[in-house]
Every structure is written in structure tokens, then in C-alpha cells.
């Protein structure tokens, strides 16, 4: 990473960290920009295979810049839209120079969420972190590890303009999620930035 001093580190134990910060003011979205990015969402929510069966993802999702591979499936990338390109440029300057891909998720209301998971790193460039930027409705961003009585969780508020950075070694140990809740009635857009190998 390039400028860690701009982000607040949270100690997770065992030498692992989770970093939190804010977008610079010039990159925050006003209501018109949020509405324009919201209009980019796909018409149909994607499906993934779980236990051999297709399950519809509980949010809209689209990859930009580089194909996104997860659970043995590939989400073909579209060109990076001008509305979100400044976020990719900023992350390349301020977080890590090899970040080259975006995954945008659109959440609406209480039924949209993402469950606990580790990001697949097989196709990621060595040493690149995972960067997530939040816009719109504030949601909980949860880290968790272990199961049953041994399960640990840490919650962080993903408010408008919040930036979270998950180093690769942290992703290997801790899962992350955006839980569902009846109290969420608005819209949220998350932009996740990663660094993938090019050329397959």
C-alpha cells in the first residue's frame, strides 16, 4: 500500500489489520451522481451456484474493467463508466498502484445484503488489498471469523463516502459481510476495487 497514514488501522490481532478512511470531498457523489450510477444497475440480478443449484444474488452486481470470477463462475466485465472511473484512479494513487478492476453492487431495502465470505484471491495480483467504497444509505459492514461459540465479529458503519481496506492476509482469516435488516429501507451502492491479473 502507498499512503497508509491516510487511513485509520484497526488491530484485529495476530498482526492483522483492517483500515478505514473517507473519500476526499471532490470524489463524494451528490444526489444527481448517485441517481446516475443507480441507473447503471443491470436489469436482472445475477445467479450463482450454491451446492450445485443456481441461487439469485440478493442485490444487483456488475464488474467493470476486468472480469470477476467467483464460485467457479465468471462475471464478464464492461468498460469502466466515466462516473466511477475517478474512484479507480484515486485508489491506484492512494492505496495500491496495481488496482485495476471494479465490482459495483446496488442494494435496495431490507432484502438486499451480502453474506459472510472471503474474497477469492486466485486471480488477484500478489499483495493487492481489497478496497470498498460506500455511497448512500448507511449499512453495517461486518468482519467475522470462527463458528459457534468461537465466532468473533466486529462491526463498522459503512456511511456515505466511507472507504474500507482489507489487506490480503486479513481476507484470508476474516470473512466480511453486509447483513440484512428490516431497518434498511433506502438505497446503497458499494464500489469494490481489486487488482487482477490480465490476460486470463
Language model: regions and residue ranges:
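Non-heme Fe(II) oxygenase metal-center motifs and adjacent flexible, charged/small-residue loops
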Residues: 1-200
Amino acid at each position: 500500500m502507498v499512503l497508509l497514514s491516510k487511513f485509520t488501522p484497526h488491530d484485529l490481532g495476530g498482526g492483522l489489520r483492517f483500515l478505514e478512511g473517507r473519500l476526499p470531498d471532490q470524489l463524494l457523489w451528490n444526489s444527481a451522481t448517485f441517481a446516475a450510477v443507480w441507473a447503471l444497475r443491470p436489469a436482472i440480478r445475477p445467479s450463482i451456484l450454491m451446492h450445485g443449484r443456481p441461487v439469485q444474488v440478493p442485490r444487483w452486481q456488475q464488474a467493470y474493467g476486468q472480469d470477476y470470477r467467483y464460485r467457479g463462475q465468471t462475471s464478464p466485465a464492461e468498460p469502466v463508466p466515466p462516473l466511477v472511473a475517478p474512484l479507480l484512479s484515486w485508489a491506484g494513487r492512494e492505496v495500491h498502484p496495481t488496482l485495476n478492476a471494479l465490482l459495483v453492487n446496488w442494494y435496495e431495502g431490507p432484502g438486499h445484503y451480502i453474506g459472510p465470505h472471503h474474497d477469492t484471491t486466485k486471480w488477484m495480483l500478489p499483495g493487492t488489498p481489497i478496497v470498498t467504497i460506500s455511497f448512500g444509505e448507511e449499512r453495517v459492514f461486518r468482519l467475522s471469523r470462527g463458528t459457534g461459540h468461537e465466532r468473533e465479529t466486529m462491526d463498522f458503519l459503512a456511511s456515505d463516502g466511507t472507504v474500507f481496506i482489507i489487506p490480503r492476509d486479513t481476507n484470508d482469516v476474516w470473512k466480511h459481510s453486509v447483513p440484512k435488516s428490516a431497518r434498511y429501507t433506502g438505497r446503497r451502492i458499494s464500489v469494490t476495487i481489486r487488482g487482477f491479473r490480465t490476460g486470463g
